[in-house]
Amino acid sequence: MIGDIARILLVANATSLGWGLRGEWGHWWGATVPGALCGMSLWLAYGRSGYGWQMMAYGALLAVSLSVGGIMSYGLLVGYATAEKGRGERSPTYGCLALFLTGGLWGFFAGVGLGLLTTGTEYKAGDLAMWAVLASAGALMGYAILVRGLDLHLTPPRSDAWAAFLGAAVSTTIFFALWSKDLVVVANSALGWIGFGSGFSLGAVIHREGDRRGLGFSTWKFMEHNVGFFGGLALAVPAALHNGGPQSLDIGSSWKWAILLFQWFMFYMVITNNLDHWTADTKWLSRRIYAALQMGLILSLIPFIYLARPFVREWSGGGSSLVFVSLVFLLNIIGTAKFIHGWGDLRSRVVATFWIQFALVCLLLLLV
């Protein structure tokens, strides 16, 4: 019983920590972090131990699935939900419902990714190509009907990418429910929607009440952690109910290289975001130093590939928990460092939350 609870809480807290860190970097590149932590923790919780390549593959695929929602805009919706001054006449109820929509769309495609990993249905390249075409067509039609035709705008003058995502979600559901008759993918996508959507809405309500009562912590950051917690919780449920645990993937040499290059690229993106902030916002770095550091980061790919060659050939996948903890530790360091110039009581509490949750994830790993 304790182990079952610990497994679900491991996924929920790992995704929560990832989403809190995602707030440091933002956008789709930041969203690769909670996706990676969610996927890896799902394998550690429900997969077979000693299969580190499987863990990292799940992390990479969930990172891609979750990151696509990063092009949607939701900052103004939080302002509506919290009744922030200057946000127009749209009500907090509107803001919460709109956050359930955008957050749900974010989680929907994460659920699709997890569903494809755990379903018993075998999909060939042609099947996935058919889905990609239908999803793209749905995105175009959704945007054309809702935005161009009906003139619906969630957050004017911000992007209306939500309409394209909604169209893609509808066509994706039709494909998997009616064409493939794959209820595993449909159920996972629905749970992803509910988890991430409710996490956004509930987090916004807590954010509003925290600001109203003058609580001494970052209610915005609490909202971000809340999104990841409920999203991870929702995605952990089908994995917990799936007999035999997650499906093992056939991982050859090309897969291994793709996984490692993804890890390099994820770290490259978040470090670059730190450098952008230190150059454009704080003016710590000159443009020449920024360019030199960027060149160094890009050239680091050469020794990375050289050092990874024996790793690809010889690593059997053992010590997967240590690999996971090491990656989370490094991400925590990078996230902590970004706003080191603005250190104060509030920032101290934000950083403390990262490290307390990191410690909790490590403890839960020992219990699963």
Where do the model's predicted regions map?
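Alpha-helical transmembrane segments of secretory-pathway, organelle, and plasma-membrane proteins
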Residues: 2-368
